[in-house]
Structures are given as structure tokens and as C-alpha cells.
Regions:
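A Rossmann-like FAD-binding core segment of flavoenzymes
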Residues: 76-94, 100-102, 107-109, 172-270, ...
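FAD-site-proximal beta/loop scaffold in flavoenzymes
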Residues: 25, 125, 131-149, 245-291, ...
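Residue-level detector of alpha-helix initiation sites
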Residues: 13-15, 119-121, 161-163, 288
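Active-site glycine-rich loop that binds ribose-phosphate moieties when present
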Residues: 139-143, 156-166
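Rossmann-like nucleotide/phosphate-binding core characteristic of flavoprotein oxidoreductases
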Residues: 1-10, 25-26, 224-228, 234-240, ...
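Glycine/Thr-rich phosphate-binding loops of Rossmann-like dinucleotide-binding domains
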Residues: 18, 41, 123-124, 165-166, ...
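FAD-binding core/adjacent interface of flavoenzyme oxidoreductases
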Residues: 1-10, 25-26, 31-38, 81-153, ...
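Beta1-alpha1 glycine-rich phosphate/pyrophosphate-binding loop at the start
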Residues: 5-79, 165-191, 261
Length: 315
């Protein structure tokens, strides 16, 4: 693409669009690469895979994730953001201006970059996992746990780390029963979280078990479990199935040019979106391995835009 960009945003979730809107209003005319099925997710990010959203401020009536992201995209366009349906596959931060390479082979030069590529939930590739996604299957208890289809029902959670403990605990507030499925005979979660789960009368633990099939008609109705020691299979009637086996940050395209934590999330300065390279910022789930909430990602995008504008003003 011809010309030098002031700011490029990589990613089109709540963090990316919030950053874009703020930079657009600062008259930077930012360029956004929203991605073309990047990480297997449509433009708009992980939120587009969420059904009903009831906890995003400003929407008293329920709205779907896709609808919310469509509104954010429209707002970005109204604020002079140029949106391109391309995926950035490589970057060069070793010299200035920075160079971004697209999957098409085209290159873009820019003075600053905001990385808002998010993180993709790890899922299981088993029969029924695609058919019942958002029809009883979810990867976010905080987002979906209070929905009517899960209230006072039996819900399964798969995982054994801190996230699984937190998700199971949260779901126990709404479900009749939560079944925590783990492939081993002990959790890897912190001891205090384990104790809370084991003392919760609404949570049942299925040790040495793995899900091998999800079944139902229009909605999810059951999960088939296989014992990892005996191979025996049992069927468990459930109305919900929640993945809590972690997330993969979408950072492979960086090629090791930024510092990442042991899970692959971008490391930023405390209380900031600044990376160790001046002019490169990271916002949203790609630099926050803990919360994975749209409103937090959006706030992070706002901070990235403000810090980016401050950086550009100092050049």
C-alpha cells in the first residue's frame, strides 16, 4: 500500500475498534487490518462467536456478539478509519518505519502499530463440538453462564487449571449441578481454588475422564465420557458444556520480535499497553491472559490509542 501510515491497528475486536475510533477522532486516519478468518475466526474477533450478550454497558436489551461488533465497525468507519479485510502474516520492527506484510504479499509501512489480535479459546475436536457450538457449548462462563438455557440445569466444565476452577465456581451460582471433568486424578490449579471447588456441594468432579462425543437434537443434551484408565464409556445428561482448557494468543505472526510470556501473550509495561519497542502497543486479550471480557478489551484499546497518540505527537 502506497504512503506512510501514522497508525495501523491489527485486529478487529473490541480492543481494535476502540483504538481505531479514538485515533480516528484524533484525525490520525488509522488503517485497520481486520483479518480474513485469522485464527479461524471471522472479522470482529472472538466476540462474534458469542450468542447473547447481556453485560456490555449501554445495551439494556440483549444483543448478539456479531451485532455488537457490526455496530463497532460502523462507528469506526464513521470516524475515518480505513478497514481492510486482510490478515497481517509478518512484521518487521527492527527498523523504522515498521513494515507489515499481508497474506497477499503486499507490504505496509507505518510509524506506529497497535496489536489487538486477541486470543482464541482452545476447544476439543470431537463429534458434536461444531454442531452444538452456542447451542449449549461455550468457552466463557462469565459471558454465558446466566443465560436461561443454563439456569437450574446440569452443566459440564472440562479442564483442571485455575480457569476451570473459576468457571465451575461461577456456573454453580446458576446451575442445578456443575460436573467438572478432568483427564487426570488431580488438578493443577492453585490449592485455594481447589479447596473451594471440592467444598462446593453443587460441584461434582469426574476424575480420569475425557469427553469423546457431544449429543443432542436442536440443543446439546448429553456428553459421552471415557475413563482414561479403563476405557469405559458413560453418558452424562447435560444442558451446557464449557471449555476451560485455556486460550491461544494470536501472536505467531510476530516472529519472536516482541517479548511474550510463557503462554505466548504479549508482555506490556505495568498499567500500560506499551511494549519494549517504542511505537508498538498491544491491547485486549492478546496481552491479558486473565479476564477475556469485551469491556476490558475495549478499555485497553482506548488506552492504546491514547498512548499511541502521545507517541506520535512526540515524533
Amino acid at each position: 500500500m502506497a504512503g506512510m501510515e501514522d497508525a495501523v491497528i491489527i485486529g478487529s475486536g473490541p480492543a481494535g475498534h476502540t483504538a481505531a475510533i479514538y485515533l480516528g477522532r484524533a484525525e490520525r486516519k488509522p488503517l485497520m487490518f481486520e483479518g480474513f478468518m485469522a485464527g479461524g475466526i471471522a472479522a470482529g474477533g472472538q466476540l462474534t462467536t458469542t450468542g447473547i450478550i447481556e453485560n456490555f454497558p449501554g445495551f439494556a436489551n440483549e444483543i448478539t456478539g456479531s451485532e455488537l461488533m457490526a455496530q463497532m465497525r460502523e462507528q469506526s468507519l464513521k470516524n475515518s478509519v480505513r478497514i481492510v479485510a486482510e490478515t497481517v502474516c509478518a512484521v518487521d520492527f527492527s527498523k523504522r518505519p515498521f513494515t507489515l506484510t499481508l497474506e497477499s504479499g503486499e507490504k505496509t509501512e507505518t510509524k506506529s502499530v497497535i496489536i489487538a489480535t486477541g486470543a482464541t479459546a482452545k476447544t476439543l475436536n470431537i463429534p458434536g463440538s461444531k454442531e452444538f457450538w452456542q447451542k449449549g457449548i461455550s468457552a466463557c462462563a462469565v459471558c454465558d453462564g446466566a443465560l436461561p438455557i443454563f439456569r437450574n440445569k446440569t452443566i459440564a466444565v472440562v479442564g483442571g487449571g485455575d480457569t476451570a476452577m473459576e468457571e465451575a465456581g461461577h456456573l454453580s451460582k446458576f446451575a442445578k449441578e456443575v460436573v467438572l471433568i478432568h483427564r487426570r486424578d488431580q488438578f493443577r490449579a492453585s490449592q485455594i481454588l481447589q479447596e473451594r471447588i471440592k467444598s462446593n456441594p453443587k460441584i461434582k468432579i469426574m476424575w480420569n475422564s475425557i469427553p469423546v462425543e457431544l449429543k443432542g437434537s436442536k440443543l446439546l443434551e448429553s456428553v459421552t465420557l471415557q475413563n482414561t484408565l479403563t476405557g469405559e464409556k458413560t453418558e452424562l445428561g447435560i444442558s451446557g458444556f464449557f471449555y476451560a482448557i485455556g486460550h491461544n494468543p494470536n501472536t505467531e505472526f510476530l516472529g519472536g520480535q516482541l517479548k511474550l510470556d510463557e503462554q505466548g501473550f504479549i508482555i506490556t509495561q505495568t498499567g500500560s499497553t506499551k511494549t519494549e519497542i517504542a511505537g508498538v502497543f498491544a491491547a485486549g486479550d492478546v496481552q491479558n491472559p486473565h479476564h477475556r471480557q469485551a469491556i476490558i478489551a475495549a478499555g485497553s484499546g482506548c488506552l492504546a490509542a491514547l498512548e499511541c497518540e502521545e507517541y506520535l505527537s512526540g515524533l
